[in-house]
Amino acid sequence: MLSAAEQLGLDTAYEQAVKSLYEGGIPIGSALVTQDGRVVAKGHNLRVQCQDTTAHAETACIRSAGRRRDWHTLILARRCSLFAE
């Protein structure tokens, strides 16, 4: 059975995959979620849209986390999970 945070991560990643599909891209999404159920960042595959073979969903998600104004307050190594769907 999944925890609420895990379910949120999978649901958010799925929503991002659908977003990529509607944009004409590869339907893969990703979400970075804390153990207490906060979405830190999300992203979707942009390889087709940006014609960039490195624009994977997980990469877009991590880049999104790095663009947060409060990035320096985030401690991610042990307190977050990265989900992809």
Give the residues covered by each predicted segment:
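Short, basic/aromatic recognition patches
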Residues: 2-23
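Residue-level signal for inorganic ion chemistry
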Residues: 13, 29, 61
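Short, basic and Ser/Thr-rich N-terminal targeting/leader segments
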Residues: 24-28, 83
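Short beta-strand scaffold segments in enzyme catalytic cores
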Residues: 28-34
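A cytosolic small-molecule/anion-sensing beta-strand core signal
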Residues: 34-35, 63
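Short, glycine-anchored, charge-dense loop/turn motifs used at functional sites
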Residues: 36-40
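Zn2+-dependent cytidine deaminase-like catalytic core
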Residues: 41-85
